[in-house]
Curated annotation (Swiss-Prot):
It comes from Pseudomonas aeruginosa (strain UCBPP-PA14). Pfam families: SutA-RBD. The lineage of its organism: Bacteria, Pseudomonadati, Pseudomonadota, Gammaproteobacteria, Pseudomonadales. The gene is sutA. Interacts with RNA polymerase. This is Transcriptional regulator SutA. Induction: Up-regulated at post-transcriptional level during survival and slow-growth conditions.
Length: 105
């Protein structure tokens, strides 16, 4: 490739990067304008945020149905359900590593 083609490629790449930065800036402006429409900070604002993060009742029911179907298939293939004691944990806690004094002065 000639130097002119390389320079043109660099210029084209710079133009694309500018477009992405502008799009990101537009997104940032949209986010800041959304904050203006939100109610004043307080308990109601926090409650609204929590409600948005929770899945809907229909979504929960779909997950329950999918889990029930998967359990039925597992049991129909000969799978068994084992009940374990409540005080049994998968991994014992790790012994804390003391790094005090491990580095030379």
């Amino acid at each position: 490739m000639s130097e002119e083609e390389l320079e043109q490629d660099e210029l084209d790449g710079a133009d694309e990067d500018d477009g992405e930065e502008l799009a990101a800036a537009d997104d940032g402006e949209a986010d800041s304008s959304d904050g203006d429409e939100a109610p004043a900070p307080g308990k109601k604002a926090k409650a609204a945020v929590v409600e948005e993060e929770l899945p809907s009742v229909e979504a929960k029911q779909k997950e329950r149905d999918a889990l029930a179907k998967a359990m039925e298939e597992f049991l129909s293939r000969g799978g068994k359900v084992q009940e374990i004691e409540p005080n049994v944990v998968a991994d014992p806690p790790k012994k804390p590593d003391s790094k005090y004094g491990s580095r030379p002065i």
